[in-house]
Amino acid sequence: MVKATLFFAMRIRYILRMPPVARLLASATFPVLVLFSSCGEAPGPASAAKDPGAGADTPEPATTAPAPPKPESPAGTSSPGQTTVPAPAPPPSRYRPRSIGTPSAGSTEARSVADAPSPEAKSSKEYHTVEVFYGTNRKPTGFREANEFYGTERHREGPMQYGKIHVSIPLHHTVGVVERPKWYKLEFSEDPKKHVMLLDLETLGKDAFFEAVDTKTAESPEHEALLFIHGFNVSFPSAIQRTAQIAFDLDFHGTALAFSWPSQAALEAYTVDQDNAIWSVPHLSRFLVDLQEKTDIDAIHVIAHSMGTRVLTQALAQARDEGFDLKLNNVILAAPDIDADVFREQILPKISGVADRLTMYASSSDTALKLSQTIHGNDRLGLGGTFLKTIEGMDTVNATDIDTSLLGHAYYGSHRLVVRDLLNLVVRHLDPPR
């Protein structure tokens, strides 16, 4: 009853926040309106169907999904169309003295973090392109299109798949936004000039993958890599799109990577996602170990969101248990959907020291975590306010006052102030003020 009430309340609130014309259309079609919560991202039109190729033969290891025609990419093209971002709201408040510094609105650092694309975000006359390397334990569907290449099933015959994808970022991209087709704008197909979309996909063998990652990272100024791990209710394309958006908005000059586990990309599949998250722990653990041992990357930054923080923290603990000495630079837990007591008593002691800096973002406006807390019956680590957990050895950032999304769960990559916070932490290597 609680979930049903919350479900319809969210839809009503969603409609009320629409423009008048869109609100009228949405009201007329309310029975069939599908809400993609901020736990995940709405898949593109080509990826809406769930595993239509389930059971199909696994594609050949070395494949390239077709790409739409891309314009010539003149070297050195600048980014003239960046959207001007309004003056920011007050920065996130901190509950601990050791917290990430946020410049004031009047400082030079208060500008858009995407004023210019990084060298890894190549520009064309019509859109930017970000290269994302990925590891996944999702089963290939048998389809050749990039949006449909991986589905929601576990890939038990491997299990890991590797590859790289080019992702478009519009010239007029807004910081914190994954631009997608909007039905109320009568957009029913993807356009790289307007949307963050997968342009192509190339699968790689394991050795070729880590060699390519090493080569790519060696070309960057500081030999760094940024790994993103998504949470509940996220499709493979959405995970890659979010990775590209974060890397672009952070002006990250290193290698962008994503680890995508088999989330069902469905609100009603929470328990299935939980099982798949736990199943993915050893695969992520091995991926992190290989990333350290098979490359010469100097610094690895990891951002995990929601249920993905369970996969990450348990993977780090498993690597320690197996005798691997992982050394990461930043580990960022965004809105962690983890039992707070389990984290404090069982996980943190095992992962202490694995990263130079461990940071958590929390919000008491996080409706998704409130629902998770109702389901589990215990406090969630990522709830702020009265639920906020300040733990020795971890910086805690209270993001309650700055999130304006429907469920208050996607602020880690969608709010400009948090993006700027991550910029200071990951790219500028600023220590938290003491």
Model-identified regions with their sequence ranges:
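Short, positively charged and aromatic/hydrophobic N-terminal segments
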Residues: 6, 14-15
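Bacterial N-terminal signal peptides
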Residues: 27-36
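Bacterial signal peptide processing site
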Residues: 39-43
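Post-signal peptide N-terminal segment of mature Sec-exported envelope proteins
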Residues: 46-93
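Lipolytic serine-hydrolase domain surface
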Residues: 80-220, 240-299, 316-330, 335-434
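The conserved beta1-alpha1 loop
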Residues: 227-231, 335
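Short substrate-entry loop that stabilizes the transition state in hydrolases
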Residues: 235-239
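Gly/Ala-rich beta-loop-alpha elbow adjacent to hydrolase catalytic centers
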Residues: 284, 304, 308, 312
